[in-house]
Amino acid sequence: MKSVEQYRNQKVLVLGLAKSGVNAARLLHKLGAFVTVNDKKKFDENPDAQELLSDGIKVITGGHPLSLLDEDFKVVVKNPGIPYSNPIVSGAQEKGIPVITEVELASQILAGELIGVTGTNGKTTTTTMITMMLNQRTNAGKAYVAGNIGVPASAIAQKATAADTMVTELSSFMLCGIQTLHPHIAVITNIYSTHLDYHGSRENYVKAKMRITMNQTANDYLVINWDSEEWRQLSKQSQATVVPFSRQANTKDGAYEEAGKLYFKDEYIMDAADIRIPGDHNVENALAAIAVAKLQAVPTAGIVQVLKTFTGVRHRTQYVETYQDRQFYNDSKATNLVSTEMALKGFDQPVILLAGGLDRGNTFEKLAPALKAHVKTLIVFGETAEKMADAGRLAGIQDIEFTDNCETAVPIAWQHSQAGDIIMLSPACASWDQYPNFEVRGDRFIKAIEQLTGKAEEN
């Protein structure tokens, strides 16, 4: 951890708690700041606020009073999920107070190297692959995973040494709140239209993603998907050295797939079929990770070892178990239709799909071809249940069932299944209409499977 004096004896507002807010507040307190924490949850229902108060940090809960702006704050550190339309946030900006996110704070104290990974889909898997590959090196420091993957970057930055690397998953929400964050290697897996309710337009969403490279120089690297003309054009905005990856062999200047084999420049790495986790999208993720690993001098044998053994990340096309010749997969992280489409394309077997969730105003017609090609039974729930069913009807699916939630969908899926089927939760929607987050949704799905198979009694 670098020595930082800029916050000592300065007033700082931490807006919104959860993991990132709690860690930011504690770090700022450690750095000598006068920290005020503000969270909308009531104090008696807010264990995070209670703990921070016991640590000597000022806590204001139960709402976001505008009177907070009367304080002479040097900076506001906001939870990434709080929109910039929030009156406290917009008011701070109007007063010229910098508004940053916890990952920006973490980057300011990080002694080691930063690798940032963003994109619409594949961030978590790619971040994890890269971290595992870097830890195959024997003559380098430790690689830590951090960020939107569930581990606050500020917690990792405090323990990482100058020899270490922090591989950080960066959401568009986080990237809106950076100013000086400077990854030596930035990765953009892909960019599709999502989170438009937060950003207001696709243009704003793309701008947020491209902020990952705004502080890079020619001595840094931008690893970017080369299989879209839009993405190729976006790379021209960066000052970094561009290292492309491609499943369509659109380039041989980086990592690419050709005739079922994976290469980095002219070096053969492995056969795509030997990657442990299924799906063409995971080949893309692997190529991005290979590019980073090669830039960081990871031996090819170490890269292959990871890709042959890595079984995936929890809630991302996560294999749960096989019961009476039916395989269960938890893809709760699939919060947009592109993620669900990619997950479906990873299977040759018939799929019973559990889908639905928060209604952000979009429709699902574009999912129909994948539904038609892969889904035998569609079980829908949540605010988008009817819209999802419409996509199923458009795809010609005859077997469509409505239910309350993903837990009640499990026994229904079982009733409609046969030996050899895949039963998969891949909602194509955010979870917030019924669950606090996608992790809880996925855990409830797994619990329902355990109830079905009898493992719940064993536990």
Swiss-Prot record:
EC number(s) given by UniProt: 6.3.2.9
Binding site for ATP: G119, T120, N121, G122, K123, T124, T125
InterPro entries, sorted: Folylpolyglutamate_synth_CS, Mur-like_cat_sf, Mur_ligase_C, Mur_ligase_C_dom_sf, Mur_ligase_cen, MurD
Keywords: ATP-binding, Cell cycle, Cell division, Cell shape, Cell wall biogenesis/degradation, Cytoplasm, Ligase, Nucleotide-binding, Peptidoglycan synthesis
Pfam families: Mur_ligase_C (PF02875), Mur_ligase_M (PF08245), MurD-like_N (PF21799)
Gene Ontology CC terms: cytoplasm
Pathway field: Cell wall biogenesis; peptidoglycan biosynthesis
SUPFAM superfamilies (UniProt xref): MurCD N-terminal domain (SSF51984), MurD-like peptide ligases, catalytic domain (SSF53623), MurD-like peptide ligases, peptide-binding domain (SSF53244)
Keyword hit for S-adenosyl-L-methionine: no
GO BP annotations, alphabetical order: cell division; cell wall organization; peptidoglycan biosynthetic process; regulation of cell shape
Subcellular location: Cytoplasm
Family as reported in the entry's similarity comment: Belongs to the MurCDEF family.
Alphabetical list of PANTHER family matching this protein: UDP-N-ACETYLMURAMOYLALANINE--D-GLUTAMATE LIGASE (PTHR43692:SF1)
Protein name in UniProt: UDP-N-acetylmuramoylalanine--D-glutamate ligase
Species of the source: Lactiplantibacillus plantarum (strain ATCC BAA-793 / NCIMB 8826 / WCFS1) (Lactobacillus plantarum)
Lineage: Bacteria, Bacillati, Bacillota, Bacilli, Lactobacillales
Gene: murD
